[in-house]
């Protein structure tokens, strides 16, 4: 099924965003684990896998529309050197996704591609949850202070 070139461009642009997020979140999770924040690392790793599922769905859609998924391009990774920097960097990606997808959904509807619009809406719903999580972590860090927040994230050895 031949897809609209503009819709395919939007799909590939979002694919680039998802591939970038996969890498950034995965590296952040490995750094968090290395710092001893095991539970936090598990959550961040799960977010990376969520982005992988988005990339898979987008890839499937591009292929169905007779397009070619571009796996050779990434946006710049923003690797935080502290938990705060990581949360802020991950939040920036999520805000960019929202800014990209909201007009993309409208364009897909105008092009009468409700399936791609629905896919983008599902991604927006997932990203809203991730934004809420990241904003909450930053708020907790502000309320508790970095030291107390970090202490709450440290894994305790089994007794």
From Swiss-Prot:
Top-rank EC class of the record's enzyme: oxidoreductase
Parts forming coiled coils: none
Catalysed conversion reaction: 4 Fe(2+) + O2 + 4 H(+) = 4 Fe(3+) + 2 H2O; Fe(2+)(in) = Fe(2+)(out)
Residues bound to Fe cation 1: 18, 51, 54, 127
Cofactors that this protein relies on: heme b
UniProt GO BP: intracellular iron ion homeostasis; iron ion transport
Residues reported in the UniProt entry to bind heme b: 52
Keyword Metal-binding attributed: yes
Protein's name in the database: Bacterioferritin
